[in-house]
């Protein structure tokens, strides 16, 4: 699904006894050898570079009075430097070599002991050759190999493959404790979402270990090793076809009548014998500024976005009736509207008359499920009267649903998964709603597990 593309990068790590003056010299030299995007250079970078180049002259511009606080005590060196930087004129700033100033900034941002990235994209052969051949005289400049992800199938399944932090980002703040406890460095590139995060420990490989000698010389102690590959159960051709079909269908559906509240669909294709996920996709419809609809990927919602399942759960609901002797196989019940005091009528989509369990499932009778739920809850139903049920009725249903994978973790190997919403109400009306899939919520992945179990 993806490849690692090796890329050459230039970095700088300040060596012992290297002065600011020497770094200025290096910045000028390197700026003539490397092509770097200098568009991010700022006024403060230019002032800093001018200050370092003319430090004595600029510091002399700060008067004795400006060097003292109101109480007569001497200001800190940092405060004095801030004043000195304001003494640099705009003409002097405009005279600064922008390329050298930006290189100097890259050499000195962050901690002095840290390795700084100078260039990591579009490195030319002659640039790489120059740095490599002159490492001994470039006082801290070096070359090394980095990598970037190449996705062989574009955006297909990309959101579930996940992301890796950039070389500039390193370990994100919210994941720092997790990774630092595992021995990572703050500037390491790490998996930060979905499969990249889930399998980081297998994908990361092993760093080379060096022994640091005098003058920051290095000797190799042990070589690094590449990380492992992981093999997914996803059938990529099926995945591509699924995404194409779903993209087309959600857009077509949105243009149909009575779809004001519709904006997304999910599909999971799995092997019910093994539980393997063969393809999965979620697509969401959005409206652009031009008023036209467009489709975006929403596949993570398969495990993170619980939905009200509706009638699909009636198969599990009818098993509750069998288990707790509310009905037997073939039991016939009258499909007619039910009325609980102070609540609206509860009906099926049409009145079906006297029906058995098979007919009730085939034609999605709500009332058949309502009457099962009343019996499971030991209720005494009378038209338009209050209805009380036993406290354990909900737990009987939830226990059965859980055996099918609803309301419990599916075990999918992704770092985030919602359990869905489990209602707290004990009202009889809500139990009836529950029995037809209109109360608790479940993720599309849980529903896929439910269907596979059946």
Where are these regions (language model features)?
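Structural motif corresponding to the C-terminal cap of alpha-helices
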Residues: 245-254, 285
